[in-house]
Design a protein with these regions (language model features):
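FAD-binding core/adjacent interface of flavoenzyme oxidoreductases
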Residues: 1, 6-8, 85-184
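Beta1-alpha1 glycine-rich phosphate/pyrophosphate-binding loop at the start
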Residues: 6-89, 93-94, 184-185
Length: 187
């Protein structure tokens, strides 16, 4: 289970924790931060497993390589600073309702070194806004062959695969063979 750090706001303030920094969670944390956090009426914390927000309807542009992500992503920490809420980086891995705690996974650098340990975050009010995921509607072959576009990581993975397939096709002698470079969009 590992060691845990307990993150507790000032005891006299109501602590509202919003898990999920998608469009809904980010909007809620921003609104609550402006109305309550900036005025010292409540402590607002946004939790997300990513450090930045990218508007989900733009993921297809990342996948196609037609958008500069750096120009469109929003740093949660900066948004929190501007709008009166705190940001905690980490993935929700557990919930202790009896003690009013969300359990956040440890976070790591790319090479595996720990950034933050597993920790518990105390709340008075909890909002789970973890969003949605793509539905394959039982379409044959989708689970085995498709890359869903639910996250920036998935969109970037698709873009790399597409570019690599194009490079491979361009480098061969002769024309592209049927089935060598197929792209199908579902949805």
């Amino acid at each position: 289970n590992g060691s845990r750090t307990l993150l507790v706001p000032k005891p006299e303030m109501t602590h509202i924790v919003v898990v999920g920094g998608g469009a809904g969670g980010l909007e809620l944390a921003t609104t609550l931060g402006n109305k309550l956090g900036k005025k010292g009426k409540a402590a607002i914390t946004l939790v997300d497993k990513s450090r930045t927000h990218i508007w989900k309807p733009l993921l297809h542009e990342i996948a196609a390589g037609s958008m500069d992500v750096d120009q469109h992503e929003l740093e949660y920490m900066a948004q929190g600073h501007w709008h009166g809420f705190k940001f905690r980086y980490g993935e929700l891995i557990g919930l202790n309702r009896a003690n009013k705690q969300v359990i956040l996974a440890a976070t790591f650098y790319e090479e595996g070194r720990e950034i933050t340990p597993q920790r518990a975050l105390v709340y008075d009010i909890l909002v789970i806004a973890i969003g949605s995921v793509s539905n394959d509607f039982g379409t044959p072959g989708v689970k085995e062959h498709a890359i869903m576009l639910d996250t920036q990581v998935q969109a970037e993975k698709f873009n790399r695969r597409l570019l690599n397939a194009c490079v491979r096709a361009q480098a061969q002698e002769g024309p592209v063979r049927p089935g060598q470079l197929d792209v199908t969009i579902i949805g």
